[in-house]
Amino acid sequence: WKPWKGASWWTAASEGPRGLPKAAGKADMTPLEAFQILDLRVGRVLRAEPHEKARKPSYKLWVDLGPLGVKQSSAQITELYRPEDLVGRLVVCAVNLGAKRVAGFLSEVLVLGVPDEAGRVVLLAPDREVPLGGKVF
């Protein structure tokens, strides 16, 4: 997965595959509208295990997103986290990007992180307890 260079090429006016907007010109939406297309929710990791079949070191995660249910994610976060440290953690997930099969495992949500100075992924998370499935805005 590579981050978008900018979301201004999306428009909410027409739906593409998986319910995502089709590409459009930059004048079609404001930066705020582009941000609002992403459905970012808070979840809690219920289970984490090494993803042995993945080409890059990864974990299989099962994330409870409250009313959205439990969703799976394949996450390349092995440098800073052990599976046992992930269970019970709150995480932020993009839930409307569509599912993708990663080495036989269906990844339904993208768990969000940011690279540290060494390029290792640091998870994004609220600093207090919040309702599972809560929308990030």
Q: Where on the chain are the PLM-derived regions?
A:
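Phosphate-backbone binding interfaces of nucleic-acid-interacting proteins
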Residues: 3-137
